[in-house]
């Protein structure tokens, strides 16, 4: 398989939008400060934009698959209106942690599926997220560059870069 493309794998809640816990309605969805600039920067550099998100609220009964699909449609329409493009792919896990599925981050299967479908070279790509599970999913998939958005730096033996805001992430992505 030819893997010529590079990707920005990104988490949704906490990266694209402010994480208010189980966000499922557009009224509760607020874009994170700096996300438009980050997406525009990476798209200009030729990165595929691939959403990798755990959405256990579906199987926990907090919202329906249809709610998730409608919010995703709103997200895509908003990006198209604001930036002139939208995400290249959306990959999600609907399972709760106790279901012990194969797709929930920190397991790498969603990233690997997206990489296969979009011919992604993981060594030229980035995973960005706001939780340790996001970073571990990137590491487990062998994504070379992992950027963690955090106000409280973690002491970790892992090779991810910790950033205080999305603007700082832009500086790392070349």
UniProtKB/Swiss-Prot annotation:
GO CC aspect terms: cytoplasm
Binding site for Zn(2+): 93, 95, 101, 103
Subcellular location: Cytoplasm
GO-annotated biological processes: ADP-L-glycero-beta-D-manno-heptose biosynthetic process; lipopolysaccharide core region biosynthetic process
Catalytic activity: D-glycero-beta-D-manno-heptose 1,7-bisphosphate + H2O = D-glycero-beta-D-manno-heptose 1-phosphate + phosphate
Keyword tags: Carbohydrate metabolism, Cytoplasm, Hydrolase, Lipopolysaccharide biosynthesis, Magnesium, Metal-binding, Zinc
Main location class: cytoplasm
InterPro entries in UniProt: HAD-like_sf, HAD-SF_hydro_IIIA, HAD_sf, Heptose_bisP_phosphatase, Histidinol-phos
Metabolic or biological pathway: Nucleotide-sugar biosynthesis; ADP-L-glycero-beta-D-manno-heptose biosynthesis; ADP-L-glycero-beta-D-manno-heptose from D-glycero-beta-D-manno-heptose 7-phosphate: step 2/4; Bacterial outer membrane biogenesis; LPS core biosynthesis
Site (Stabilizes the phosphoryl group): 53, 105
Obligatory cofactor(s): Mg(2+); Zn(2+)
Known partners and oligomeric status: Monomer.
Entry-linked PANTHER family: D-GLYCERO-BETA-D-MANNO-HEPTOSE-1,7-BISPHOSPHATE 7-PHOSPHATASE
Family note: Belongs to the GmhB family.
Protein name: D-glycero-beta-D-manno-heptose-1,7-bisphosphate 7-phosphatase
Species this chain originates from: Helicobacter pylori (strain J99 / ATCC 700824) (Campylobacter pylori J99)
This protein's encoding gene: gmhB
